[in-house]
Structures are given as structure tokens and as C-alpha cells.
């Protein structure tokens, strides 16, 4: 069985002296695993960095076998993010979450398109506005991932009152939005719902990003990784830690340059 297609590199690990065991995400074949001979060597290692888009060629005698992979880089997303700690953390997170969440060999064409688009945005710009845009983009992507896996969040109306305005909470049990009025005395038991999930023009502030990561992380942990007996990926946890570091009122300005030393709802 042979095929050739654009693929997003999700992970690459050393296999033998210089070979790379890679996990790729493709439009027609979903997540696939393969062996790149010499993939960790000096000439090829940069190509197979997680987050890069490559033109991959996969060959195996049978579909269930570990394929032999070769390819050329199309888009060097990983290198573009090296100048920003947060951009690289975002890119690493979407790769790790995708790699851990999706079953091998199942087609998710729409999610592949969304993931490739998002990966191409990280590190493209710099500054506070770019940081906000990247975090909002990542959080919306995580919502799309949940939806594509069958765990859509319902943000259209309040689960208690039916109203569509002032939706500021989400039920951790049902994934349905709750208005300020509908929350009442149960507000402390609900997840804060950042406005960036409702308004495409809203990119939020660090407190919103932290709340958003907690929100999507709750459903990823419970609905996606829990049944697989897997923890939330380490790259996703690191991203949440970086965002949390932006919230401390007494912190020094963080180095994001990449140069590191029961509610009724």
C-alpha cells in the first residue's frame, strides 16, 4: 500500500541510531505511524519537527504494518515559532492533543484542515495582539476538536432559562451555557465561559485564556482522554502553566521570546 499526501508532523522520536518513528496527521488517512530512515540525522531532523507540514510518502505491504515514510517540508511551522515561547507551546500543544486524542487510521478531513490552518498561524506575528490572537485561536480549535470527537459544547442559549444573552458560565456536567441569572447560587460550581468562545472579535486577556484552558481541559480530560486511560498531554499542561504565569500580579514580565533560562444544567 502506497500513498502520498500533505501531512502534519505530530511527533517524532528516536528509533535506533538515527531513524525517526513519526506520527503524522493526514486528510484521508487520519493519524498514521511510520519510520523515517535517517529522520533524526543532521540533514533530516529539521524536517520532522512536530508542527511542520510535509509532503509525505508512506509505503507498506499491508495497511496495518508500520510504514516506511519519506518526505519534504512544505511549511516549517516549528522553526517559525522558535522566537516565541508561547507560540511554540501552542504549536506543541495542538500536536500532542491531536496525537493522543485521535484514533489511528480514522479519517478527520475537516479537523485536518482546521489543524493545519491553525498550525500555520502560530509565530507568524509578534506582540501582545498576536499573542491574544494565537491563544483565542488555540482555544477555539480545542472546541472544534471536542465537537469533531462527538463532545460539542452548546453555547447557543442558557440551559436554565433559555435566554441567549449574558452567557457567562458553562455547566461542567452537560457542556451547556448558563446565563448570569440562570446560574444564581450555583455560579461557584460552574465553569467561567470566556467571551472569546462567543464573539469571534474577542481575543481575551490572560485571565480569559486561563479560564478557557480550564474549560476545554475539563472536557478533554473527562470525555476524550479519560475513556482512553490517558492523562492530558504534557505539552498541554505546559501551555496552561505558561498562561498561568501571566496572571501573577507580582511576577516579573514573562519571557515569551523563546530564550528560556451538581447544577440543574
Region roles according to the model:
Residues 1-21, 25-265:
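Non-catalytic alpha-helical scaffolds and adjoining flexible linkers that form interface surfaces
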Amino acid at each position: 500500500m502506497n500513498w502520498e499526501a500533505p501531512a502534519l508532523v505530530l511527533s517524532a522520536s528516536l528509533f535506533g541510531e538515527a531513524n525517526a518513528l513519526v506520527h503524522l496527521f493526514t486528510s484521508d488517512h487520519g493519524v498514521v505511524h511510520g519510520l523515517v530512515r535517517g529522520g533524526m540525522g543532521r540533514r533530516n531532523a529539521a524536517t520532522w519537527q512536530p508542527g511542520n507540514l510535509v509532503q509525505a510518502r508512506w509505503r507498506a505491504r499491508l495497511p496495518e504494518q508500520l510504514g516506511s515514510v519519506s518526505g519534504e517540508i512544505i511549511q516549517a511551522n516549528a522553526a517559525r515559532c522558535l522566537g516565541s515561547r508561547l507560540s511554540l507551546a501552542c504549536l506543541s500543544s495542538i500536536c500532542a492533543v491531536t496525537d493522543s486524542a485521535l484514533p489511528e487510521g480514522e479519517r478527520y478531513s475537516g479537523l485536518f484542515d482546521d489543524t493545519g490552518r491553525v498550525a500555520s498561524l502560530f509565530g507568524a506575528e509578534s506582540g501582545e495582539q498576536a499573542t491574544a490572537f494565537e491563544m483565542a485561536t488555540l482555544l477555539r480549535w480545542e472546541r472544534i476538536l471536542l465537537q469533531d470527537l462527538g463532545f460539542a459544547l452548546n453555547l447557543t442559549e442558557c440551559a436554565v432559562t433559555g435566554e441567549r444573552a449574558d452567557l457567562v458560565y458553562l455547566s461542567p456536567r452537560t457542556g451547556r451555557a448558563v446565563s448570569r441569572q440562570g446560574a444564581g447560587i450555583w455560579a461557584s460550581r460552574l465553569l467561567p465561559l470566556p467571551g472569546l468562545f462567543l464573539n469571534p472579535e474577542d481575543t481575551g486577556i490572560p485571565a480569559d485564556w486561563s479560564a478557557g484552558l480550564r474549560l476545554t481541559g475539563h472536557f478533554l480530560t473527562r470525555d476524550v482522554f479519560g475513556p482512553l486511560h490517558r492523562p492530558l498531554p504534557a505539552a498541554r499542561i505546559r501551555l496552561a502553566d505558561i498562561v498561568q504565569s501571566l496572571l501573577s500580579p507580582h511576577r516579573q514580565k514573562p519571557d515569551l521570546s523563546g530564550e528560556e533560562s451538581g447544577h440543574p444544567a
